[in-house]
Amino acid sequence: MKQLKRKRKSNFSVQETQTLLKEITKRKEVIFSKQLNTTINVMKRMAWEEIAQCVNAVGEGEQRTGTEVKRRYLDWRALMKRKRMKANIKLVGSGFPLPSSDLDDSLTEEIDEKIGFRNDANFDWQNVADFRDAGGSLTEVKVEEEERDPQSPEFEIEEEEEMLSSVIPDSRRENELPDFPHIDEFFTLNSTPSRSAYDEPHLLVNIEKQKLELEKRRLDIEAERLQVEKERLQIEKERLRHLDMEHERLQLEKERLQIEREKLRLQIVNSEKPSLENELGQGEKSMLQPQDIETEKLKLERERLQLEKDRLQFLKFESEKLQIEKERLQVEKDRLRIQKEGHLQ
């Protein structure tokens, strides 16, 4: 059974390496930060991803990841160490011996700082293939190098030195480098090491304060709602009390009319009794009594109608009052809803 070979990505081109070094220079405060916490680690990982995006934007056809560009930088730094060592060995062999301590210092100087390389006057760039020498066996993301003509203008030494000088950090340009573009997403990076450690609990305290403030507002709204509900129940209670009073008043009026009716009936019965002794006098009196009774009946009916009219007017007034209260409760309900939506936003 044939073993399938995994297709490996091509080597980094000159343009990709140049872009990689430039982007590392822009983000050196983040990538080479000595602080160790979760926030800094996330920021470093995002910085490498952004560098990979910038390298991919060159358009060489390969899609690099943050891990690949980081590994490419480590290879590049190892290459710089080897070339610096060779250059120092040449100096020693040409009659300029260096003490062992000075040799070690020269090998490590500036390598582990910021970017890890600098534009050294005693270092001679022989070929632009140095951009690709860091590939080889040190990385897993590269394949055989592309064949290029070293005599082409693209690989002129002067142009290469100019490109290198554009990506090598310089003390005069360090203050002009742009800040890490997404640093605001993970708080402001300060030169004081204890600043980020202070910001995290401070941010948590602010979040807790905001949560408590929102909870307090919610409780205030709930208290207002309960107060409105209490007022509504009080109004409903008053309305029922008025209805009970009206019912009792009507019941008393009904009993009074019943008594008046009994009284009139007794008067009629008494007026109809014949009197043999006073037939003439009683005849005249009996003619007047039916008229008086009819007048009383009309008067009582008029009073009853007036009472009924007053009752209807009172009920109308109660109806209008309840309608006004209903509208007030609706307005209060809308106000609480708008206030609640404002807090949620």
From Swiss-Prot:
Annotated ranges, domain Myb-like: 4-77
Cross-linked sites for Glycyl lysine isopeptide (Lys-Gly) (interchain with G-Cter in SUMO2): K9, K114, K142, K237, K254, K273
Record key words, sorted: Coiled coil, Isopeptide bond, Phosphoprotein, Ubl conjugation
Keyword Cell inner membrane included in the entry's annotation: no
Any one cellular-component term (Gene Ontology): nucleus
Pfam families: Myb_DNA-bind_5
Residue ranges of the region described as Disordered: 143-175
PANTHER family: MYB/SANT-LIKE DNA-BINDING DOMAIN-CONTAINING PROTEIN 4, MYB_SANT-LIKE DNA-BINDING DOMAIN-CONTAINING PROTEIN 4
Protein name (record): Myb/SANT-like DNA-binding domain-containing protein 4
Gene name linked to the record: MSANTD4
